[in-house]
């Protein structure tokens, strides 16, 4: 299935648009159905099995709910984490930041383009349902930038395959709104399969790359520095 990138409605809506609010709520449900927070928590714990992470950056963080669910799973073993949530829109509520604080995670939200976020290094950078928005040229640029700022990059994206595409057309049946139903199909068509992200990673030497299908609907990519 050829990768096709098209604009998504949610990206063009103001954060306070009722359709955007409803669609973000839908996305929280979809992430739960896909099990993406379980996948991310498991990958983090496997990669940092001998010590907890201290600094984590999420790019394309949306409303922050995804990383919050991940934090709720790992916070008992990983306290006092500094988390930076980066998104192009101001979507993260005070309630979400307070929920992070209740887990002893210090969290900051930055409104910034992913290509212009603060020049800092982090133990790990994560992304969930975000990279599929970019074509290969921009992806290569983004991956090159990330490889210089972290020793671990974990990504979960839509799996570009017939079964996820079929299921994406049925989201109306679980009450998702028109924005979500439209964007879900586009997201799967722009998703990844095989080793497409590995092929775009700028440094092969000194990195361990893992890329595979994860569950029924997701695609997992991990780049971990070995030297």
Model-predicted regions and their roles:
Residues 57, 63-116:
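Class I SAM-dependent methyltransferase SAM/SAH-binding core
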Residues 134-145:
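A short, conserved alpha-helix within the catalytic core of class I
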Residues 126:
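A conserved beta-strand element that flanks and buttresses the S-adenosyl-L-methionine
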Residues 12-43, 47:
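Class I SAM-dependent methyltransferase Rossmann-like catalytic core
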Residues 1-13:
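N-terminal auxiliary segments of SAM/dcSAM-dependent transferases
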Residues 209-227:
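Core SAM-dependent methyltransferase catalytic element
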Residues 158-204, 211:
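C-terminal alpha-helical "lid/dimerization" subdomain adjacent to the S-adenosyl-L-methionine
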């Amino acid at each position: 299935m050829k990768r096709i990138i098209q604009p998504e409605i949610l990206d063009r809506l103001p954060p306070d648009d009722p359709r955007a609010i409803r669609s973000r709520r839908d996305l929280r449900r979809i992430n739960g159905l896909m099990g993406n927070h379980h996948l991310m928590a498991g990958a983090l714990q496997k990669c940092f099995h001998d010590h907890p992470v201290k600094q984590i950056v999420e790019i394309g963080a949306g409303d922050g709910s995804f990383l919050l669910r991940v934090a709720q799973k790992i916070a008992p073993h990983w306290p006092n984490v500094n988390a930076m949530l980066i998104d192009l829109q101001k979507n993260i509520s005070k309630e979400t930041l307070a929920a992070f604080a209740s887990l002893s995670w210090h969290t900051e939200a930055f409104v910034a383009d992913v290509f212009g976020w603060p020049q800092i290094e982090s133990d790990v950078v994560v992304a969930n349902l975000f990279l599929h928005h970019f074509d290969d040229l921009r992806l290569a640029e983004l991956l090159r930038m990330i490889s210089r700022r972290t020793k671990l990059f974990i990504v979960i994206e839509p799996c570009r395959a017939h079964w996820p595409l079929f299921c994406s057309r049925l989201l109306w049946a679980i009450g998702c709104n028109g924005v979500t139903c439209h964007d879900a199909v586009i997201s799967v068509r722009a998703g990844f399969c095989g080793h497409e992200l590995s092929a775009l990673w700028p440094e092969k030497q000194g990195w361990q790359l893992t890329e595979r299908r994860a569950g029924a609907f997701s695609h997992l990519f991990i780049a971990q520095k070995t030297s």
